[in-house]
């Protein structure tokens, strides 16, 4: 999102702010706040926000008090013992006046007086003041800026009369930096350096320097979204401000355009518009202070009058201009694409190796500028330039955006062209620049060199009152709709041929500067933006109490309308059911409530990070797990292990499309073993790949926090990962036309070669889980904490996870488990490999988990289930089983659950004891039984427990200890 810096005084030149004025449109007259003759920055931001533009105050005036023009009458140089040379000056200024119009005595303390310090009275008597100054860049008779006692400077500096170097200094002669108008602090500000000729001769001693140097102006920063390029100018923002307050807008552009001339331009690549103008006999000496100050507030540095004028017109109108030194051009200009291996030395000192798709402006000797982006040094305008060729073009936004990103050049011009500039404004902006050059640089306008424009008016859009009602959700009259659209510049007429008694139809033709208005939805957005968002009624949505997951339909519809009469626009469902925004939001809130901190990382990584942390299950969503396998299971049929190119392993890029069998004996064609997706134009050349896991970003985030002393971290991220192109027809299940009984559902991908971009959630923990306090022992994060984090994710999604020991190249061997949900492998959890953690300057004990949310959603989340609280009591018993060391506890829990049946509400492992003299171990579980309908009896609990023991004995040879 681009930011436009808007000086307040500049904006108010183009709008009328008289109190009580009512605009021609009459829109929102009851809701608009009336401003005074001089609205402050807060008023402007409030008005712009009401029409959809956010902003903030950037430059607020920090100068106040008696800051006036003084003349240096005489000075005496003194060298002090510390080696510093100072000047003891006599400066003639105007004395500040008190309310009774009597001069304020120099002997009085200004801080205790009530005199008018904000503006000097030019009719007051002149007086001479003694001032100590450390600068030496001025002479007798120079006009300077004097800050008298009682004035305030930027940074909270309060000027008082005080003794300096043995003299009482009755004020201060200010520098550029002290006044906030520049960075020069070596010498004081001489007005002869700022003003020349008639402007300088009109300045009198005692004049208010704040008004003279425009130091009371403030600026606001307005955020411009990519679709609102028409607002990327003072003219555009002024139009929106006038719209927000029902006041007239004064267009600064001249209506008269320049006549066509005879200069020849070779347009091999046709732009949307291209105009040039030859101007001679330029006096390129000094830019007037009012323009320098406005450009400074707009964030642009002053260069020379011609360049400043082109920048000024660009900020004012939104049309970028470029000035060429006409004497540096050889032959005629040509607009073409760059040749192979052609280069351009830019005005900022860089050398660009141009691409054959780059649009350039060239002459007989080569490229002069990268069109719409930046100019070249060979034809740059300097203070010695006498003849210029002024260019105003309009180019394809996509071409300019690609060139800008290709060369990593983001200029004021490219920011505007990439957002689309009004084609019809080019010639008027050129005339405006010519007018300023003639007035400020004595330029002689010779002729309009070339005039080319290719503009086709947008086709009218058919709009009805029912269209607005359907999109917005509330009704407006035809008069309101027509009035609001005319207010933004649209041509609106009634279409009686398509109108009916119930539906009023209009033909709407957007203005040339609103290329973003292309359909009914765009027009509806403008209508509600102009009329007011407060006209949209509030609707309360509630989650009904139910035991089953909510279906996709959440509203009761009757004849295509909601119960309250508002229509609901049809939404095309996605091809596959990924995790929804609401599910992700609730999961994030759940994790944050548990003490985790959410972070957002860039999706760009280097190749090493993309490979080592790839969670391979995410591209194998058909992977299943058999809970009855006993010992630590091998990856089941249907899962392809990923290996990086060049590494050894059974699978890899050469094993794409291997067919295996799922448990239902249905054929599955795997997704290809994915490699990292590279970016053609990365922001950082060292991170030119899309992430395949969230863990690399969390490791970098942890490193940044640890380097700043934040050592105890529990962070998480919810975001997409990018796993290459899919060739499989299913996300879960098989290729059968009917629903696979083993997989329980069918989800077909309709198109081939799609990039699989599942949402995943990842948690990373390191440091202290509990800080040491009085009566409380501290504790570091350990493996149990990250398993608890995975369980928190499960609770947030309304599902159950269990864990099976496994291996993964990013995790510590023996301290890694894969996460299973409904017999499907959906992620990993464990301790990060210490060597990987150390590469990020992290301690050895770093724990993480990563879960594929899209897979969980397809398996069936139940976030919105509201369960009834139990009314019957629970019965708790312990169970200790002795079995082999190689049997995983998760497998035992799964079997015990199956054997105990529905009465078993919860089971968890509370103790493990390994026998030293045998290969046996004892596992102790806490079991909670409950019947939802009635009170349990001891006989039923014992029977359920015996059934569980019997099944565990048959599966694993387990023996219950009594």
UniProtKB/Swiss-Prot annotation:
Domain of life: Bacteria
Binding site for Mg(2+): 516, 522, 525-526
GO CC entries: phenylalanine-tRNA ligase complex
Record field: catalytic activity: tRNA(Phe) + L-phenylalanine + ATP = L-phenylalanyl-tRNA(Phe) + AMP + diphosphate + H(+)
Pfam families: B3_4, B5, FDX-ACB, tRNA_synthFbeta
EC number: 6.1.1.20
GO terms for MF: ATP binding; magnesium ion binding; phenylalanine-tRNA ligase activity; tRNA binding
Domain (B5): residue spans on this chain: 456-538
Positions of the FDX-ACB domain: 870-961
Every tRNA-binding domain range: 85-201
CC cofactor: Mg(2+)
One of the protein's GO biological processes: phenylalanyl-tRNA aminoacylation
Subunit structure comment from the entry: Tetramer of two alpha and two beta subunits.
Protein name according to UniProt: Phenylalanine--tRNA ligase beta subunit
Organism: Tropheryma whipplei (strain Twist)
Taxonomic lineage from the root: Bacteria, Bacillati, Actinomycetota, Actinomycetes, Micrococcales
Gene transcribed to yield this protein: pheT
């Amino acid at each position: 999102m681009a930011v436009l810096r808007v000086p307040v005084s500049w904006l108010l030149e183009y709008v009328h702010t008289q109190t009580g004025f009512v605009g021609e449109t009459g829109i929102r007259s009851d809701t608009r706040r009336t401003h005074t003759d001089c609205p402050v920055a807060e008023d402007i931001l409030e008005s712009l926000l009401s029409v959809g533009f956010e902003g903030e105050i950037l430059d607020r005036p920090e100068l106040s008090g008696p800051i006036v023009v003084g003349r240096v009458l005489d000075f005496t140089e003194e060298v002090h013992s510390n080696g510093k040379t100072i000047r003891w000056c006599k400066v003639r200024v105007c004395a500040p006046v008190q309310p009774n119009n009597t001069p304020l005595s120099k002997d009085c303390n200004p801080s205790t007086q009530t005199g008018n310090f904000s503006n000097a009275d030019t009719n007051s008597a002149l007086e001479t003041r003694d001032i100590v100054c450390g600068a030496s860049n001025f002479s007798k008779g120079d006009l300077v800026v004097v800050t008298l006692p009682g004035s305030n400077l930027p940074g909270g500096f309060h000027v008082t009369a005080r003794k300096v170097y043995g003299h009482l200094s009755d004020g201060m002669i200010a520098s550029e930096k002290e006044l906030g108008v520049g960075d020069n602090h070596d010498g004081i500000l001489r007005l002869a350096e700022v003003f020349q000729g008639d402007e300088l001769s009109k300045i009198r001693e005692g004049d208010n320097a704040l008004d003279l140097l425009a130091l009371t102006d403030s600026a606001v920063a307005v955020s411009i979204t990519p679709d609102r390029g028409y607002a990327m100018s003072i003219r555009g923002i002024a139009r929106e401000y006038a719209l927000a307050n029902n006041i007239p807008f004064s267009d600064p552009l001249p209506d008269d355009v320049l006549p066509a001339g005879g200069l020849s331009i070779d347009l091999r690549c046709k732009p949307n518009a291209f105009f040039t103008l030859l101007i001679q006999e330029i006096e390129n000496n000094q830019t007037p202070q009012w323009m320098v100050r406005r450009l400074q507030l707009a964030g642009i540095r002053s260069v020379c009058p011609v360049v400043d004028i082109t920048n000024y017109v660009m900020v004012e109108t939104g049309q970028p201009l470029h000035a060429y030194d006409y004497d540096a051009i050889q032959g005629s200009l040509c607009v073409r694409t760059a040749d192979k291996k052609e280069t351009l030395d830019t005005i900022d000192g860089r050398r660009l190796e141009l691409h054959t798709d780059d649009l350039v402006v060239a002459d007989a000797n080569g490229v002069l500028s990268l069109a719409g982006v930046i100019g070249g040094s060979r034809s740059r305008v300097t203070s010695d330039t006498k003849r210029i060729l002024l260019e105003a073009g309009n180019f394809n936004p996509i071409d300019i955006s690609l060139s800008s990103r290709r060369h990593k050049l983001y200029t004021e011009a490219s920011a505007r062209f990439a957002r689309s500039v009004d084609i019809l404004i080019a010639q008027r902006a050129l005339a405006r620049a010519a007018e300023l050059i003639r007035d400020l640089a004595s330029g002689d306008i010779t002729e309009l060199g070339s005039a080319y424009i290719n503009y086709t008016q947008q086709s009218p859009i058919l709009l009805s009152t029912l269209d607005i009602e359907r999109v917005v959700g509330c009704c407006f009259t035809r008069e309101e709709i027509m009035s609001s659209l005319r207010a933004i510049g649209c041509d609106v007429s009634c279409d009686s041929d398509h109108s009916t008694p119930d539906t009023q139809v209009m033909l709407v033709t957007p203005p040339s500067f609103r290329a973003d208005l292309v359909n009914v939805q765009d027009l509806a957005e403008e209508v509600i933006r102009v009329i007011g968002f407060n006209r949209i009624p509030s609707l309360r949505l509630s989650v009904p109490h139910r035991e089953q997951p909510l279906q996709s339909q959440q509203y009761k519809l009757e004849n295509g309308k909601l119960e309250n009469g508002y229509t609901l626009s049809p939404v095309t469902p996605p091809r596959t059911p990924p995790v929804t925004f609401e599910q992700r939001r609730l999961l994030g809130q759940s994790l944050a409530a548990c003490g985790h901190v959410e972070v957002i990382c860039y999706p760009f990584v280097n190749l090493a990070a993309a490979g080592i942390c790839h969670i391979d299950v995410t591209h194998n969503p058909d992977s299943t797990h058999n809970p009855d396998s006993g010992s630590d299971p091998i990856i089941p049929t249907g899962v392809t292990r990923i290996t990086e190119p060049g590494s050894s392993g059974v699978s890899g890029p050469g094993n794409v499309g291997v067919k295996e069998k799922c448990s239902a004996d249905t054929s599955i064609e795997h997704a290809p073993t994915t490699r990292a997706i590279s970016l053609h134009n990365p922001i950082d050349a060292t991170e030119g790949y899309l992430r395949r896991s969230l863990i690399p970003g969390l490791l970098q985030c942890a490193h940044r926090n640890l380097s700043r002393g934040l050592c105890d971290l529990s962070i998480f991220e919810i975001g997409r990962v990018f796993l290459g192109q899919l060739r499989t027809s299913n996300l879960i299940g098989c290729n059968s036309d009917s629903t696979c009984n083993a997989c329980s559902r069918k989800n077909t991908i309709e198109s081939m070669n799609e990039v699989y971009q599942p949402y995943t959630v990842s948690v990373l923990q390191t440091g202290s889980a509990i800080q040491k306090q009085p009566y409380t022992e501290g504790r570091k994060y350990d493996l149990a904490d990250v398993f608890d984090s995975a369980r928190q994710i499960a609770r947030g999604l309304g599902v159950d996870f269990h864990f099976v020991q496994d291996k993964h190249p990013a995790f510590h061997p023996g301290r890694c488990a894969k996460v299973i949900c409904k017999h499907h492998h959906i992620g990993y959890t464990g301790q990060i490999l210490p060597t990987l953690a150390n590469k990020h300057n992290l301690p050895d004990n770093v724990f993480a988990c990563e879960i594929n949310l899209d897979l969980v959603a397809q398996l069936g989340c139940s976030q919105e289930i509201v369960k009834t609280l139990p009314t019957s009591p629970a019965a708790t018993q312990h169970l200790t089983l002795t079995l082999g060391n190689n049997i995983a506890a998760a497998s035992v829990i799964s079997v015990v659950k199956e054997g105990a049946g529905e009465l078993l509400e919860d089971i968890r492992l509370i103790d493990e004891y390994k026998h030293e003299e045998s290969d046996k171990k004892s596992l102790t579980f806490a079991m909670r039984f409950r019947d939802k309908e009635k009170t349990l009896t001891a006989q039923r609990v014992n029977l359920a427990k015996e059934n569980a023991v019997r099944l565990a004995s048959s599966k694993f040879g387990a023996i219950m200890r009594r």
